Amino acid sequence: GDMRDPLVARRVLAGAEVVVHLAADVGGVAYLAGRQAGAFHANHRIGINVIQAACFHRCRRLILIGSPCSYGPNSRLPLVEKKLQEGFPSGETGCYGLAKLVVSETANLFGNALGIETVTLIPGNIYGPSDHFECNRSHVVAAVLRRAVVSQLLGRKTFSVWGNGSATRDFVYVDDVARTIAQAVTAAHHFSGDVLNIGSGSETSVRQLADLVAETVGGGIEPEFVEEELVGYTHRVLSNELARSVLG
């Protein structure tokens, strides 16, 4: 069903004790840049519907999946949870980050009022199986990998990489994120509006990623950087110390 429909959300959450909110309208920087108002509206609406349904059913715990896009563009690295509200999400991906931030704060307000535990997990740049490889939806790992493979199949010696390669991200494998979510589901800790980063704690440049993809694909193919294209935030890396202390 479509979680933008509040009745669907209420039906999906019926009987749930713990809710993990993963539903989203999301894609890479190009996808969000092309529909900022629509992306904000959809993700805000989905989130509010989930919160209201969780409250209606008196669920015990609500786990939200946030976004590093919710941090301000000038936040000091590594990004720490207590700095989340010190900057305003902006740029091409700010619409998504703002929606996630508003939903998180709304969940905390309702949770405190009704005795529902709330926690927001903020993963880094997730990659792995079942990623979006579509041209207009992919994030950087899937996008770079797809362009490299397609270029090699077409007999080309280069593949395009957006930006100059200096932008950095905190890449985290999807299985690691899933394990952390599972830990949050079963944690003995009493959540009360907690925010926890989920990252590798390592800053990797897009150039490093492109070189690794080129080496993996093989055939002598090399990255060609296209500086005029969108890159989103310049540098991102998450501190995961709080998550380690809370979840182990």
Regions found by a protein language model. Name each.
Residues 3-44, 53-56:
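NAD(P)H-binding glycine-rich loop region in Rossmannoid oxidoreductase-like domains
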Residues 4, 70-71, 126-128, 141, ...:
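Conserved sequence/active-site signature of Rossmann-fold short-chain dehydrogenase/reductase
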Residues 46, 50-54, 106-107, 180, ...:
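Hydrophobic positions on the long internal alpha-helix
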Residues 48-93, 113:
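Conserved Rossmann-fold NAD(P)-dependent oxidoreductase catalytic core, especially the SDR/UDP-sugar
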Residues 49-51, 73, 91-124, 143-154:
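Active-site Tyr-X1-5-Lys
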